[in-house]
């Protein structure tokens, strides 16, 4: 049964976004020369990747970035949050722990990746001297609201009530309301408040056709996600996730960006930075994937479009803006 499958797969889920499995043989603090001589020329840009941890999506990103920079004559050093952070060149902070560590350092140029928009905005509040310049930026891990709204409207066109449960109102709440409204969707909002997450969720599900999950760790975490997925399944209200891990565990679908896609975007920004020594404003991922759990759809009696069709629809809308 799907319910048993959900229960069995929850242990595989890494929250908030990726499952970071440790990998044998992963060594940090390695210098990975990308120029033929293995040495940086005088005045040449150096790039240091600071990872929040070993393996998993952190290492996937770093490996993909190294490959994307091949033949670009840009040395790439890889280190961890417990090492000395360089005070020159460009530093790529991978994950929130690395972002916090690097923001507190003397690194002159910092690009943050695998961090959510809310996480990045928190960094700017905690380190205000980093704000308002071309020396500190990010590529968000989460997706633009428009992509999420398009996915919801396209995958379940006959359903219109979208439940949104949060601990504190998300910064883009007004934009969520607008994007949903443009597509004929009605947002059903509920703050957890003094209730427990299960109590608040159960009330919300009674008035929702689907549930939109956002990266809110006070609600969607290792302790609660199993019960949330089971509650949505029992109520026959599909969950719209925000990562591939959620879809594999029992969410109906998600739009997300893989570490490799973000790495390609970072490589492009590095090439620009090598010429201008300026970082662009923080931005959303350019490339993305859509994943659909067809088994969940069948179990809930839903007829949904393929992930390929859904992704194409979102891409077409992105291109028209």
Predicted regions and their residues:
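N-terminal secretory signal peptides that target proteins for export/translocation
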Residues: 1-20
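Generic N-terminal simple sequence motifs
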Residues: 5, 12, 29-32, 153
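Bacterial N-terminal signal peptides
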Residues: 23-36
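Short hydrophobic alpha-helices and adjacent helix-cap/hinge residues
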Residues: 41-321
């Amino acid at each position: 049964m799907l319910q048993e499958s959900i229960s069995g797969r929850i242990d595989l889920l890494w929250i908030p976004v990726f499952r970071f499995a440790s990998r044998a043989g992963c060594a940090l603090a390695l210098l990975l020369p990308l120029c033929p001589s293995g040495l940086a020329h005088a005045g040449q840009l150096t790039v240091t990747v600071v990872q929040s941890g070993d393996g998993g999506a952190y290492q996937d990103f770093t490996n993909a970035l190294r490959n994307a920079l091949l033949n670009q004559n840009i040395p790439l050093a890889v280190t961890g949050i417990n090492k000395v952070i360089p005070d020159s060149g460009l530093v790529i902070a991978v994950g929130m722990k690395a972002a916090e560590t690097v923001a507190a350092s003397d690194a002159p140029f910092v690009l943050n990746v695998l961090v959510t928009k809310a996480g990045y905005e928190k960094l700017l509040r905690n380190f205000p001297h980093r704000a308002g310049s071309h020396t500190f930026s990010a590529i968000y891990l989460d997706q633009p609201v428009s992509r999420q709204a398009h996915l919801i409207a396209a995958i379940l066109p006959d359903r219109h009530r979208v439940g949104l449960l949060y601990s504190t109102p998300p910064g883009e709440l007004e934009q969520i309301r607008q994007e949903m409204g443009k597509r004929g969707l009605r947002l059903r909002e509920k703050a957890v408040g003094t209730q427990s997450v299960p109590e608040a969720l159960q009330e919300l599900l009674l008035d929702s056709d689907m549930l939109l999950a956002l990266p809110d760790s006070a609600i969607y975490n290792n302790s609660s996600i199993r019960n949330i997925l089971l509650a949505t399944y029992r109520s026959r209200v599909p969950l719209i996730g925000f990562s591939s891990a959620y879809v594999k565990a029992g969410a109906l679908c998600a739009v997300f960006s893989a570490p490799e896609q973000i790495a390609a975007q970072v490589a492009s920004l590095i090439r620009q930075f090598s010429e201008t020594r300026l970082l662009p404003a923080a931005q959303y991922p350019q490339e993305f994937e859509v994943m659909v759990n067809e088994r969940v759809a069948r179990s809930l009696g839903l007829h949904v479009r393929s992930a390929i069709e859904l992704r194409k629809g979102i891409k077409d809308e992105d291109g028209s803006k």
